[in-house]
Structures are given as structure tokens and as C-alpha cells.
Amino acid sequence: MASTQLSDIFVADYYGTLEPANSPEKTAVYESGIITRSATLDNIAKNGQGTSEISYWQDLDADEAPNISSDDPDDLGAVGKAEQGSMRARTLYLNKGYGVSDLTAELANSEPMQHIRNRFGTYWTRQWQRYLMGAGRGIIAANIAQNGGDMVKDAGASISANAFQDAAFTAGDAADMFGAIGVHSVVMNQMVKQDMIEYLRDSQGKIILATYLGKPVFMDDALTYAPGQFLSLFFGQGAFGYGEGDPHMPVEMQRNAAGGNGGGAEVLGERKTYILQPAGFSWQGSENRNLSPTAAQYASAANWKRVFDRKQVPFAAVISGTATP
């Protein structure tokens, strides 16, 4: 009996309408509110350029005292100035292909296209979070290098509640803006041992979310600072803006008759156009459309520059652990 081939069941238009069970939008990170989809970033992602400038109005200077009104017509009030600034956003052009041998189990399912779509959903979710955490590491590294680390506190050998509190209050009276925390598994272990973690459970008692002071806590072992040291990141509401473009061919199935030593080979590929923009920071890296940065390059201090004042930036961090040679 002949086995099912990808080409036997693949219908591009139908495939494109399927929602992956594990799409980025369904992750706890996205649902926490720290990432906000932006129509502006959607439009930029669709413009076909590697980078674009985003203009914004700077806040009025609250340190300027108001004029004192009088009845003297010649007493002219001082006029303040509203100024614009700009930041650069980087578009990511990404793709991934799976060969038919990678999808054998999915082809055996009663809904093979949905299962294949779910496989891609899981893949993109992991990549998406790597870029997000990479950007978080990069902007903190940039803050230390360029701004004297005014968003960062050092906890010493082990994490503590005091260190978390001190980090949050680097934002002064805006400290209540933080809505989620990302930590390394070593730090999470320390938090659990110190009874800092509370858990949300579903109706069956299954843990669905770990929290600290009501804030979701996410584990990612990419959150290191140096050998032996860890980076815990605070994210505020809307910490990242998110946009998605329209690849010319977002999904494509290719069959190569000569592949497989003449037995035929099939590859299903997806293409993504993303923007993930940390609030208050401007991209300083490569602008080449054909050289999209990797998640590791997102984590480089040299690729980011803060353009907002400290209190307007929804990020803070704690460094913990003991550096090893």
C-alpha cells in the first residue's frame, strides 16, 4: 500500500486559514500584556525595508514652571517647545522548511494539515521567545554600557526579594508599571526555595502559571549575564511592540522529483516577516534587508540605544550569581 505523501493532502489556501495550537499569540508571555500588536509596526513590516524610523513626540518638560497669569497686556508668557524624537525598528525576514520525513507522524493523523500547522506553531513560538529574550538581554547590556546601569541592580550570589524590589524602583514612582518577570531556571529554583512563588491552577488543580507578587514569571535559560551569573528581567505592560508583514509566499510546498535518489522529496516551508521592538530603544545594528539579525545578535549591547528617559522605559533587571573565570 502506497504511503501518504505531503502533496496528496496539502492545500495552501486551507492550510493558511488554520490557527496553530501553539501560536506565539497563545503563549503566557503574549497574554501577559507585555507585548502589544501595533498597526504602525504592521505597516513598517510590510514596507519591504530592513529598518525604518519611527517618530514620536517627547513628553512636555514637567520641570518648566507654568506662567503666572496677570492683567498686564505687555507681560508675555514663556512658550515651551514640543519636540519630536525617533527610533529605528528592525524587520526580521525568517523562514523554516520541514522535509516529509520530519512530518511522518503528522501524515498519519486524521487531520494531518492541522498537525503539521501545529508543528510549525511550536517552532515559531520558540523562535519568537528567543528573539524576545535576546532583545531583553541586549537592551539591559546596552543600559549597563551606555547609561550607567540605571535600570539594573546586583543581588550578589543569590536572588532576593529586596533585590527585586530595588530593581523595580529604579523606575521611581513608575515602579508599578511592571507586569511580568523572566528568570533563569537557577533563579526560579532559588525563588521557590524562598517561598517567593505562588501558583495559579486550573479547575483540575494543574499549575498553569507561576507568579511573583501577582506578576507572571517565565523561565528561560537564555537569561544569563556572564558565566555563573544570571539576568532576571522585569517587563512592563506594552514593553514590546509587535508587527507582522506579508511575505510574498508565506507557505509553500516544493516537490523535487530527483530528490531521494530519484524517489522524490518534498519540503513544506513557512516564511515570516516580524518586527519585535522594545519600547524606548532604537536598533543600532545592521540595516541590510538580506541580513536579518539572529536572536544572539539581538542580545548584543552594541545593537541597541535607549532614546527614552528612565521612567518611560518598561524594563528593569537584577543580576545574580557569582562570576566564574
What is each stretch, according to the model?
Residues 2-8, 239, 243-325:
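Extended, compositionally biased alpha-helical segments that mediate assembly or anchoring
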Residues 141-216:
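Extended, solvent-exposed, turn-rich assembly/linker loops in the middle of proteins
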Residues 102-173, 293, 297-314, 320-324:
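Alpha-helical scaffold segments that mediate packing/assembly in large oligomeric complexes
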Residues 185-188, 196, 203-267, 271-272:
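Extended serine/threonine-enriched, polar tracts that run as long, contiguous segments within proteins
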Residues 1-89, 293, 302-325:
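N-terminal "assembly arms/tails" that initiate or stabilize quaternary assembly
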Residues 62-65, 108, 190-193, 199-200, ...:
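Short helix/loop capping segments that flank catalytic or ligand/cofactor-binding pockets
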Residues 77-83, 206-216, 220, 289-307:
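Short, cationic low-complexity segments
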Residues 54, 83-145, 176-182, 186, ...:
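Long, contiguous amphipathic alpha-helices that act as assembly "spine/axial" helices in icosahedral shell
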